Amino acid sequence: MCGIVGIVGTQPVAERLVDALKRLEYRGYDSAGVATIDNGAMDRRRAEGKLFNLEKLVSEKPLPGVVGIAHTRWATHGVPNEINAHPHFVDGVAVVHNGIIENFSELREELSAEGATFTTQTDTEVVAQLLAKYTREGLGHREAMLKMLNHVTGAYALVVMFQDDPGTLLSARSGPPLAVGYGRGEMFLGSDAIALSPFTNEITYLVDGDCAIVTRDGAEIIDFSGKPVKRERQISQATAFVVDKGNHRHFMEKEIYEQPEVISHALSHYVDFATRTVKDADKAIDFASLSGLAISACGTAYLSGLIGKYWFERYARLPVEIDVASEFRYREIPLVPTQAALFISQSGETADTLAALRYCQQEGLKIGAVVNTRESTMARESDAIFPILAGPEIGVASTKAFTCQLAVLASLAVAAGKARGTLKPGEEKQLVQQLIEMPRIMSKVLNVIQPQIEALSRDLSRFKDVLYLGRGTSFPLALEGALKLKEISYIHAEGYAAGELKHGPIALIDENMPVIVIAPHDRFFEKTVSNMQEVAARGGRIIFITDEKGAAASKLETMATITLPNVDELIAPMVFSLPIQLLAYHTAVFMGTDVDQPRNLAKSVTVE
């Protein structure tokens, strides 16, 4: 969600701060700002909308100063505008904040009763007001910071700058991630290592309850009671990647076409291409002895987990409990230590998923993290890490991270089946061979289907509502297709299990309702065709996504039929992801929406 950067440097920092914010754009935002100290005075520039608005403002009205903080805001309290954009100033205190101050209403009332004047609608301003109040009362900056931290509740990462101490930044973490970066004669703070990667690869990740006092000479880390704590300094694997679309119009398009390559790279971590066998899974989780598996995630990652459930149950005969992370820990699920839990997150920082992870830890379960960021909080708090190796994903709507999650879950399910002795003789090699061939098949599909998808998207963009149907692993894929379309085109879309059509959704079917049916020629095909006939009988416009066998077997009239190669059931979800991603992408392009950063969405959701 919000992104934070801070620099205590030796040269002007404003442009460097804005450049670092560009590396946090993928998290989602609706406004941005930067502040510096120069000659004992603080100044700031803030702008609503895209970062180029802030960049232009800083270019027209430069900000001198070698110490500064910057922020991209995703609105939680108060509308997205310049006034509510960070940094917030109160009496010589500047604050940037990621998260939610849960008791801000109570604090705002208390401070207002004492005479404080609030100029924004944000929860963040209470932090600046409290710090200003405590320093007026005579507390030093460190003492004021600690008193404030023990007075606010919620999830937050904070960086604070005091006008009368121009060589120091104070920071704290209680929930959302925050990292300290070590340079030569300068120091950095950032929401993640990617933001700091142009400056340094030497990182310390703060943990919940840490407060860091950062100067040019280094960082002192204390807990919220003021006691010194030691945190490991490590070399980050994040690289200063170039934020470049290449020859593509959008990052999402680029990331769709990167999938064959990144999936091949991910698979090489989990399967042996020469022997056609799975590599041993992380030994921290013994799949052979498990009585069950819990899976939890949010959004697209949750839908990859739903597909993974089918695989673990089918190939490893392993019972799987799955729920969205925001509900998981509140259900009081009867868990036992003979189970393990997998948590799936592109960023590894999703707040609800982390909360569910910690719930399972308390229940004594071994924890596995399926993440794209090895240095994330989720990875650091897990017993086993299963990296998806998708590379940086900038588009808010996940594409390559989703299919890499699927590739990893498929590999783990086969590995679990091997460990548990539930695979038939020769089945491991057969399944691994399908996984090995998958990137080639996906590349072929991408080279063939775009013209048809693009033409179809023009027609689809005229409709206000769309249904997606599927059975088996195609049901979660229908949910994912609907999610993608609504995320980036803003067309209302819903996904259903095809067998549920008669239990309600069929009431919506008429000539104004496109119905996208995902149906490879598998063991569910004939039943899905029966559902298609029910749609056709009511005038629904069918878009049929199937394979060569399915196209030959169905004689129904459709609005369009997208025909893919015949593939094994194991890899079908990855291959069939491609047309639903491209369909959503091109529909959004025709509608003129912001494909890479759709309204109201954030890439990394770090608050509950």
Swiss-Prot record:
Compartment(s) of residence: Cytoplasm
Question: Domain SIS, which positions?
Answer: 281-422, 456-598
Q: What's in the keyword line of the UniProt record?
A: Aminotransferase, Cytoplasm, Glutamine amidotransferase, Repeat, Transferase
Pfam families associated with the record: GATase_6, SIS
According to its UniProt record, the EC number is 2.6.1.16
Active site location: 2 (nucleophile), 603 (for fru-6p isomerization activity)
Q: How does it assemble?
A: Homodimer.
Q: What is this protein called?
A: Glutamine--fructose-6-phosphate aminotransferase [isomerizing]
Q: What organism, scientifically named, is this protein from? A: Agrobacterium fabrum (strain C58 / ATCC 33970) (Agrobacterium tumefaciens (strain C58))
Q: Which gene encodes it?
A: glmS
